[in-house]
Amino acid sequence: MLKTLSLHACAAAFVLTASGAMAAPADDAKAHFQAIGSGDLTTLMSSYAANTQFNWVGGPLDGTYASAEAIRGVWEKFTKSQGPLKVTMDKLEESTNPKGSTVSANVQFEGKAPIKVRYVLTFREGKIVSETWQIDPKLAMAAAY
């Protein structure tokens, strides 16, 4: 009886630990956006896979970046020039299959001026492998309450 109870307790602890260890891609995307807003480079860089491709479309940082060093350089320039930003998200959607997940969202970063971005992140094995930051000044955002 005690052995059976111990096995059930161990199994329950394993399930709780395993399920708590992996956040949903939508949650990871939200954390990524918040890290951008707060300028937290450590959190930002820890979310990338080794072979991430980052496409920044529009604005002074326009380009494709394909190494951790290049991506860090972009975020260093951006966070230095912008400072802390208020982050507003709208229309966040997640698509998942066994090979990975894609999260898309309308995101507004607001500091010196509002920066409206159509964001697309692709995750594989819990890490970002593709990131697209599309600046879109006409992007519609839901009204904040």
Regions found by a protein language model. Give the residues of each.
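Short N-terminal segments immediately surrounding and downstream of signal-peptide cleavage
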Residues: 23-42
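Short, well-ordered alpha-helical segments enriched in acidic and aromatic residues
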Residues: 40-55
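Bacterial N-terminal signal peptides that target proteins for export
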Residues: 1-10
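A short gly/proline-enriched turn/hairpin at secondary-structure junctions
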Residues: 53-66
